[in-house]
Amino acid sequence: MTEAGPAGTDTDGPVSAGPVSTGSAVATAGALWAVGGVVALLVWAVYRLARISIAAFDQPFAWYHWAALLAIIPFMAWSEGLRGFQLRFSPRVAERAMTIRSQPTLLRVVLAPLYAAGYFEGTRRERLGVYFGTHGILVLIVLVHRLDQPWRGILDAGVVVGLSWGTIATLALSVRAWRS
């Protein structure tokens, strides 16, 4: 077996995480995998949470349930949808997908959704934000899971709105980045 040439180009050598041809189908597939993987995760979460949210309406709602629902939906649209996704997360996903397209490496292409989300090759601050954000979300999932209906469904309705906004923002910003 021979050693890999520059940037892992020798096909008889070991696989490397080096650069992949920029204009290649692999680079394009990697960028699509980045956005598609992130969007698939968001859509899956919306689907699961929407079912729980809809089930809340099987319970009788008092005025305070309606008040909570009417407060949580615009709050989550603003905080999660606009501030969290449209202004922070979605632009990063679009930008990093285009980085995969223009500067692909084997690692970036294979782990494209994780790269696009910022789990590696970002600044220390970005990575810490992603890891702490992920852990915070996991803690919230555990806590909300313990709530009884209709409260769980009310909170999940807000999350569904935020995640739906995030899905649309991620797709729209990615299409815009792809065209530029």
What name fits each language-model region?
Residues 46-56, 81-86, 142-152:
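Juxtamembrane "helix-exit" motif on the non-cytosolic side of transmembrane helices
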Residues 21-26, 54-65, 151-160:
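Membrane-interface segments at the starts/ends of alpha-helical transmembrane spans
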Residues 57-94, 168-171:
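Hydrophobic alpha-helical membrane-embedded segments
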Residues 33-40, 65-75, 130-133:
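Hydrophobic alpha-helical transmembrane segments of polytopic
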Residues 140-180:
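Alpha-helical transmembrane segments and their immediate juxtamembrane interface regions
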Residues 118-148:
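Alpha-helical transmembrane segments and their membrane-interface junctions
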Residues 81-123:
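Membrane-proximal soluble regions of multi-pass membrane proteins
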Residues 2-52, 163-180:
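Cytosolic-side membrane-entry/anchor segment at the start of a transmembrane helix
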